[in-house]
Amino acid sequence: GGSGVTQSGRFLAYSTDTTGDERYTLRIKDLATGELLEDTIEGISSGLTWCGEEYLFYQRVDDAWRPDSVWRHKVGTQVTDDVRVFYEPDERFWGGGSSDRMEKFLYIESGSKLSSEIWVLECDNPTGEFRCLRTREAEVEYDVTYAEVGGEPRWLVLHNAHGPNFELGECPLGPLPDDLDYLRVLVPHRDTVRLNAVGAWARY
């Protein structure tokens, strides 16, 4: 399964599968007291993402074990009160959630083997509406990472619009351009080197 600790270190959320059917049960533990909270969410995918101390995002699966939806849970409330924040009806696509290292944004990625689409929400507004950065395009995959460049907030955008080995560009926060040629290129596509991922740190 998956696991995650809140930034303060107080709560641990973890998911387990004891039958092998890849449908997980999520529990939350208070690490300060050792107490298991009553919150129990059954029949979900393995992934989970914290947003502050109060909210947890997780994925549910359909009958074919495809993660098709992302849900928001408030710690200490009934599972029946959980809110579905994203649904992917296209059976070719799988949905998943994450947050960046700085916990600035929550991300929902819906991806297939050949294309992807990303939705974002500020972590300080966990009950807000996710926004699509760029609608899916056939045979184009992209990923984004939040970074501060020269003190300015930016998106680092990894995409394969210009070739199968991917290219790295950057742009201001907000929706991505439909034409990715408008990104400022940081690392161009190369035939001999493939870019798999990007991470941002203060000096790198």
Where does each model-flagged region fall?
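Conserved beta-propeller blade repeats
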Residues: 1-15, 42-59, 90-109, 137-158, ...
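Multi-bladed beta-propeller domains
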Residues: 1, 19-21, 29-46, 73-94, ...
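Generic structural signal for nonpolar/small residues that stabilize regular secondary structure
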Residues: 70, 106, 118-119, 130-133, ...
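A flexible loop/linker signature enriched in serine peptidases of the S9 family
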Residues: 16-25, 40-43, 59-69, 79, ...
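Structured loop/turn residues at beta-strand edges in well-structured enzyme cores
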Residues: 7, 65, 101, 128, ...
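Gly/Pro-rich turn-and-neighbor structural signature
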Residues: 99-127
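Conserved Ser/Thr-centered positions that define the repeating blades of beta-propeller domains
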Residues: 6, 50, 73, 100, ...
